[in-house]
């Protein structure tokens, strides 16, 4: 029994989001299993996998030899191995790169499209889920397992949950919440990730940025104490030699269209506009506002104005504060 994604509607900002059940069709799951899974993953990603507890999840980066990210991964322990969530558009490429050296290790790396990914967010999301699961994750235990279901907790931009489960449980949850929750497609979760400052890597931006250019270090996703991993030299150089000049910015305002991942935007300089940055993700909300996540120089003045490329009207975008410090977590 396949689970059918919900029809899309315009996403809402977290501050006024009603209880919403979200199908996460633009995200995908993958796993690594086998006796060598921890050791192998330790040599592939930026975080110290050995320190990842059963009750935790973490946003980490998987880089090439030059330190450019194939993708970022929402990583957690799963069974006798690990699982991670990433954007569906990058999963095949990311898995192919991670498998390159797997022949020498006792591991199996595979996509998992049998699992269903759902988000629960908005007004009284915790209370709604408490009726269906015995234990819910929280700030102290952001990952819990309830039977066939893994639940992940997120505190930003407001409390929300990711539900990783089978099609039967997903359908049951959908049926039970149908009367009290609105349904929406994955653009709503994307809007919340933009507000949260969680970097979103889609295919056009794969293999383009070092992790620090997307604030992974501020989210606790880089260990500078662990042993060798793919891209470590360049990631370390960015920290210790100040080689990274970019960071992730959260912009909000209005635009005549929604910019696509990989596009640049325009920055106001006096009477003129100059192209800058790279869009990671953008959405238009139900109130007409445009939210965008853009990698730009990390020394920008907070009052700088921006606009969508080739914007003809008076629409502009401004910098919004991120809900976390850019210091290393």
UniProtKB/Swiss-Prot annotation:
Localization annotation: Cytoplasm
Keywords recorded for this protein, A-Z: Cytoplasm, Folate-binding, tRNA processing
GO CC, alphabetical: cytoplasm
UniProt cross-references to Pfam families, sorted A to Z: GCV_T, YgfZ_barrel
Major site of localization recorded for this protein: cytoplasm
List of residues binding folate: 27, 189
GO molecular function, one term: folic acid binding
Gene Ontology biological process terms from the UniProt entry: iron-sulfur cluster assembly; RNA modification; tRNA processing
Family assignment from sequence similarity: Belongs to the tRNA-modifying YgfZ family.
Purpose of the protein: Folate-binding protein involved in regulating the level of ATP-DnaA and in the modification of some tRNAs. It is probably a key factor in regulatory networks that act via tRNA modification, such as initiation of chromosomal replication.
Protein name: tRNA-modifying protein YgfZ
Lineage: Bacteria, Pseudomonadati, Pseudomonadota, Gammaproteobacteria, Enterobacterales
């Amino acid at each position: 029994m396949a689970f059918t994604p919900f029809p899309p509607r315009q996403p809402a900002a977290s501050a006024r989001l009603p209880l919403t059940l979200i199908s996460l069709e633009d995200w995908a799951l993958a796993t690594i299993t086998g006796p060598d899974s921890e050791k192998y993953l330790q040599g592939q990603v930026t975080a110290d996998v050995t320190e990842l507890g059963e009750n935790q999840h973490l946003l980490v980066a998987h880089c090439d030899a030059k330190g450019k990210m194939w993708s970022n991964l929402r990583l957690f322990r799963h069974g006798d191995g690990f699982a991670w969530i990433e954007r569906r558009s990058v999963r095949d490429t990311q898995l192919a790169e991670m498998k390159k050296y797997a022949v020498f290790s006792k591991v199996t790396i595979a996509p998992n499209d049998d699992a269903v990914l759902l988000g629960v967010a908005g007004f009284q999301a915790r209370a709604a889920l408490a009726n269906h699961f015995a234990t819910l994750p929280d700030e102290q235990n952001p990952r819990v397992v309830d039977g066939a279901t893994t639940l992940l907790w997120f505190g930003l931009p407001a409390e929300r949950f990711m539900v990783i489960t089978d099609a039967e449980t997903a359908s049951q949850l959908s049926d039970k919440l149908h009367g009290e929750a609105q349904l929406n497609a994955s653009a709503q979760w994307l809007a919340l990730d933009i507000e949260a400052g969680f970097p979103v890597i889609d295919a056009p931006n794969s293999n383009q940025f070092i992790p620090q250019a997307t604030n992974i270090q501020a989210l606790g996703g880089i260990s500078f104490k662990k042993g060798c991993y793919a891209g470590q030299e360049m990631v370390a150089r960015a920290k210790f030699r100040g080689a990274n000049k970019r960071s992730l910015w959260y912009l909000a305002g209005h635009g005549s269209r929604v910019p696509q991942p990989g596009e640049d935007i325009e920055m106001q300089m006096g009477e003129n506009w100059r192209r800058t940055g790279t869009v990671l993700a953008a959405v238009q909300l139900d109130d007409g506002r445009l939210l965008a996540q853009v990698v730009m120089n990390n020394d920008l003045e907070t009052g700088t104005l921006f606009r969508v490329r080739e914007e003809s009207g008076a629409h502009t975008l401004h910098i919004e504060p991120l809900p976390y410090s850019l210091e290393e977590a």
